[in-house]
Amino acid sequence: MITVSVLNQRYPCRTRDRLWYREIKTAIDKILAGDLTTPDIGKVSLDDNIFNASSASRSKEIAQAVTRRINAVDSAYLSFFATRNMENQQLLCIVMVMLTDHSFLEFMDTVYREKLIQHDDILRDSDIMGFFHRLQEKDENAAKWTDAGIKKARDNYKSMLKEAGMLSESGTERKIIRPILDKEMEDFLQSEGLARIYKILAGERE
């Protein structure tokens, strides 16, 4: 069972985040094979460059994101991840982002899910910027974010959703691609206490 502790955390404005699918898959494969432990991800990433980072600083940045996301789930999640195809694994990576980024979780809940429910299949830059501005109005920490930082976070959201197969390739208006969730995925997310996140991905009301 996974605790969605991110709901008690501050809203971050992550300007350099990515889906990191291949990096997360590499780490999970090594953990399940007994070749890596989560606390060692940072050291192994720096010493052996297992994520093929372009620099030491980038290696550290990737390792921090991968560690944060893997720490947010349990061993059952890692094992389930390993059994799924690439498309499902990318969706599971999106779930891991939601579990570690309060801002992204709220965006997916209030914007992406509502689009699915209303059968509005276009995500506009203005939808994402409007979300951030509403967040700034209600949260004093978010109110300090710069416009430049918000635009970078917006672009990161689009990039992650595109890589996960949930958004079309490019443009200020992008077509939303409804995720395909089989019964096994639904049952697993429900059993892990992630019913809310399942409903976000499925475009269902609470």
Task: Indicate where each model-derived feature is located.
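Long, low-complexity intrinsically disordered regions
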Residues: 112, 116, 120, 136-145
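Positively charged, polyanion-binding regions of nucleic-acid-associated proteins
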Residues: 92-95, 100-121
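Catalytic DNA-binding helix-loop module of base-excision-repair DNA glycosylases/AP lyases
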Residues: 106-112, 127-132, 160, 164
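Short runs of predominantly hydrophobic/aromatic residues within well-ordered alpha helices
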Residues: 17-27, 59, 63, 101-108, ...
